Swiss-Prot record:
Keywords: Cytoplasm, Methyltransferase, Nucleotide biosynthesis, Transferase. GO terms for cellular component: cytosol. Pathway: Pyrimidine metabolism; dTTP biosynthesis. The gene is thyA. Catalyzes the reductive methylation of 2'-deoxyuridine-5'-monophosphate (dUMP) to 2'-deoxythymidine-5'-monophosphate (dTMP) while utilizing 5,10-methylenetetrahydrofolate (mTHF) as the methyl donor and reductant in the reaction, yielding dihydrofolate (DHF) as a by-product. This enzymatic reaction provides an intracellular de novo source of dTMP, an essential precursor for DNA biosynthesis. It holds the Pfam family Thymidylat_synt. The active site is at residue 160. Its main location: cytoplasm. PANTHER family: THYMIDYLATE SYNTHASE, THYMIDYLATE SYNTHASE 1. It comes from Idiomarina loihiensis (strain ATCC BAA-735 / DSM 15497 / L2-TR). DUMP binds at residues 22, 180-183, 191, 221-223. It catalyses: dUMP + (6R)-5,10-methylene-5,6,7,8-tetrahydrofolate = 7,8-dihydrofolate + dTMP. The keyword Aminoacyl-tRNA synthetase does not apply. This is Thymidylate synthase. Its EC number is 2.1.1.45.
Length: 283
């Protein structure tokens, strides 16, 4: 929690105003932020200086791991975060590749589970990584990336947190996640949860101990219409101790994740928080 607040304060103190062309809104911006999460000791990075809702972030992660391409699929598992980008993003609404209501196109999990090769066949990046790690193999390329510039026009949004690199040292699994852009007041809460949960979950199904998750952000920003709430409300609050995340021990394979696992298989204990803050969202 401390590193999150330090990043927020750094943006407020040192950020440079940049106009975001996609949203048309000014952003207070810094370049390069390195965060890390202690998964080994279950220090779950759920924001405590405002009420945070972790289950939607978990549901979104499950949708990515399943390769979902429709906002309706995400809604069905308890996540509404893709409704706006699928149905209210004007550039995507005008894109001839859009297949209708709720279509997201070839974004995030579609790339992770079905990357198109030059011969027209598809590569399942996630399955390759899970298979290797389950055998104790780390080829220094246990990477799942959603970043495919050749298909950007086929999706509603370029991936923000775009690459996950797993590393195995002995029987301890580590994760380094890379993010090109981060809406810190709103998006980072989700991103922290997902980095932590992804390492914990993959370690569990591959039979390893989780170590640390490292989270590297390039462009970290606060939108102009979020600044007052962050500076004058959230940053004035004292954080509470970190809660813990408990994952259903019956989740033992990628097939389990694909078929029956839900957000309710992830439980948080010891969570104390301040009142909610309703930050505006830029589509």
């Amino acid at each position: 929690m401390k590193q999150y607040l330090q990043l927020c304060q750094r943006i407020v103190d040192e950020g440079v105003w940049v106009k975001n062309e996609r949203t048309g809104i000014n952003c207070l911006t810094v370049i390069n932020a390195d965060l890390e999460y202690d998964v080994a000791n279950n220090q779950f990075p759920l924001i405590t200086t405002r009420k945070s809702y972790y289950k939607s972030a978990i549901a979104e992660l499950l949708g990515y791991l399943r390769g979902y391409n429709s906002a309706a699929q995400f809604r069905d598992i308890g996540c509404k975060t893709w409704d706006a980008n699928a149905n209210e993003n004007q550039a995507w609404l005008n894109n001839p590749n859009r297949k209708g209501e709720d279509d997201m196109g070839r974004v995030y999990g579609v790339q992770g589970r079905s990357w198109q090769k030059p011969d027209g066949s598809h590569l399942d990046q996630l399955k390759k990584v899970i298979n290797n790690l389950s055998k104790g193999i780390d080829d220094r390329g246990e990477i799942v990336t959603f970043y495919n510039p050749g298909e950007f026009e086929l999706g509603c949004l370029r991936p923000c947190m775009h690459t996950h690199n797993f590393s195995l040292l002995g029987d301890t699994l580590y994760l380094t996640s890379y993010q090109r852009s981060c809406d810190v007041p709103l998006g980072l809460n989700f991103n922290q949860i997902q980095c932590f949960a992804l390492l914990a979950l993959v370690a569990q199904i591959t039979g390893h101990k989780p170590g640390k998750a490292y989270h590297k952000i390039v462009n970290a920003h606060i939108y102009e219409n979020q600044l007052e709430l962050m500076r004058d409300v959230q940053l004035k609050r004292e954080p509470f101790p970190s809660p813990q995340l408990h994952i259903n021990p019956e989740i033992k394979s990628l097939e389990d994740i694909e078929t029956w696992v839900s957000k309710d298989d992830f439980i948080v204990s010891g969570y104390q928080c301040h009142d909610p803050i309703k930050y505006p969202f830029a589509v």
